[in-house]
């Protein structure tokens, strides 16, 4: 038997604010979980809000934990993010590719910037979005102040990251590098059906039975 309560949680890695608690009752008594921990038991993890070092570390830890629990069962990764730090996002991306279980991705709301790469990086055939979700791809943003030599170093790094991210988008979408470079030159928003056509996701889901966990 389960019931819900609401409690304020402080210092949440993804700054989720008020978190519902699930109270499970059994013959041994009651046990409380926050809703995200309860869903983690069902192999569901979330990226909510910006991609930061804290949120990325949390997601990496959950991916590794779920692999240790069952290396043959899919993990379901729900994304609602405006993007964020490239280095943090790449930590999540590399872990998704590293672990053995397939990671099925689902866009709810938006997957922009680094969020769009993580969406596209799910297991082939298991990348989804909901009908009214939005996906945005673009080139990485950066700014730096300092000595001219340091600015030059950071400019080279930004150009490297731009090329690397384009290579990864090309790999996961099947689009050519030339197409990716053109389409990411400015903010490029795509709806659900256009995201399927572009290769960012495999299908648009309108109900649970169509494929998502």
Curated annotation (Swiss-Prot):
GO cellular component: cytoplasm; endopeptidase Clp complex
Keyword flag Phosphoprotein: no
Active site, per annotation: 113 (nucleophile), 138
Catalytic reactions on record: Hydrolysis of proteins to small peptides in the presence of ATP and magnesium. alpha-casein is the usual test substrate. In the absence of ATP, only oligopeptides shorter than five residues are hydrolyzed (such as succinyl-Leu-Tyr-|-NHMec, and Leu-Tyr-Leu-|-Tyr-Trp, in which cleavage of the -Tyr-|-Leu- and -Tyr-|-Trp bonds also occurs)
InterPro entries linked to this entry: ClpP, ClpP/crotonase-like_dom_sf, ClpP/TepA, ClpP_His_AS, ClpP_Ser_AS
One Gene Ontology term from the biological process aspect of the record: protein quality control for misfolded or incompletely synthesized proteins
Locations listed in the record: Cytoplasm
Chief place where the protein resides: cytoplasm
Single Gene Ontology MF annotation: ATP-dependent peptidase activity
UniProt xrefs under CDD domains: S14_ClpP_2
EC number assigned by the record: 3.4.21.92
Xref: PROSITE patterns: CLP_PROTEASE_HIS, CLP_PROTEASE_SER
Family: Belongs to the peptidase S14 family.
Record PANTHER family: ATP-DEPENDENT CLP PROTEASE PROTEOLYTIC SUBUNIT
Quaternary context: Fourteen ClpP subunits assemble into 2 heptameric rings which stack back to back to give a disk-like structure with a central cavity, resembling the structure of eukaryotic proteasomes.
Protein name (record): ATP-dependent Clp protease proteolytic subunit
Species of origin: Nitrosospira multiformis (strain ATCC 25196 / NCIMB 11849 / C 71)
Lineage: Bacteria, Pseudomonadati, Pseudomonadota, Betaproteobacteria, Nitrosomonadales
């Amino acid at each position: 038997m389960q019931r819900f309560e609401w409690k304020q949680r402080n210092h949440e890695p993804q700054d989720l604010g008020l978190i519902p608690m699930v109270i499970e009752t059994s013959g041994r008594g009651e046990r409380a979980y926050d809703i995200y921990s309860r869903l983690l038991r069902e192999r569901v993890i979330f990226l909510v809000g910006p991609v930061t070092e804290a949120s990325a570390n949390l997601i990496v830890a959950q991916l590794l934990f779920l692999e240790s629990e069952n290396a043959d069962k899919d993990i379901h990764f729900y994304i609602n993010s405006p993007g964020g730090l490239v280095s943090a996002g790449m930590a999540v991306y590399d872990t998704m590719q590293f672990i053995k279980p397939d990671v099925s991705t689902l866009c709810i709301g938006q997957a922009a910037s680094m969020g769009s790469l993580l969406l596209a990086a799910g297991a082939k055939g298991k990348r989804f979005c909901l009908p009214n979700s939005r996906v945005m791809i673009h080139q990485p943003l950066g700014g730096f102040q300092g000595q001219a030599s340091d600015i030059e170093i950071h400019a080279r790094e930004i150009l490297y990251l731009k090329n690397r991210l384009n290579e990864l988008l090309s790999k996961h979408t099947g689009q050519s590098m030339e197409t990716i470079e053109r389409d990411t030159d400015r903010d490029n928003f795509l709806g659900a059906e256009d995201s399927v056509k572009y290769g960012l996701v495999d299908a648009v889901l309108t109900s649970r039975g169509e494929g998502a966990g």
